[in-house]
Amino acid sequence: SLLEFGKMILEETGKLAIPSYSSYGCYCGWGGKGTPKDATDRCCFVHDCCYGNLPDCNNKSKRYRYKKVNGAIVCEKGTSCENRICECDKAAAICFRQNLNTYSKKYMLYPDFLCKGELVC
């Protein structure tokens, strides 16, 4: 769920999901269109695509469990949906951490109308 995802983001990046990633660029937050603005925004695009591959799962509200083992996120065994959602969120949180050096405050609260075009997963 968004609760676990937010916790993962904080643990991996030291940033609060809201406001840091809730409306960043063209893809972080609800929906998305256009060309990702930077590597962090591309993390969100890939995360959206990952969720898009789980049409039968309630991605944003489905709770799951994970733990940290030697600093690494490990998704705990749950239902198929829980496991797959956790893996999508884990990949995004790690992607955010790997791209912290290019995170730019200018893309926070980025206006949707500046996001043009369509990308296909």
Swiss-Prot record:
EC number of this enzyme:
3.1.1.4
Sorted alphabetically, the keyword list is: Blood coagulation cascade inhibiting toxin, Calcium, Disulfide bond, Hemostasis impairing toxin, Hydrolase, Lipid degradation, Lipid metabolism, Metal-binding, Secreted, Toxin
Location (main, coarse): secreted
Q: Give the catalytic activity.
A: a 1,2-diacyl-sn-glycero-3-phosphocholine + H2O = a 1-acyl-sn-glycero-3-phosphocholine + a fatty acid + H(+)
Tell me the Gene Ontology biological-process terms attached to this UniProt entry: arachidonate secretion; lipid catabolic process; negative regulation of T cell proliferation; phospholipid metabolic process
Cellular component GO terms, alphabetically? extracellular region
Tell me which PANTHER family the record gives.
PHOSPHOLIPASE A2 FAMILY MEMBER, PHOSPHOLIPASE A2, MEMBRANE ASSOCIATED
Q: Can you say what this protein is called?
A: Basic phospholipase A2 daboxin P
Q: What is the lineage of its organism?
A: Eukaryota, Metazoa, Chordata, Craniata, Vertebrata
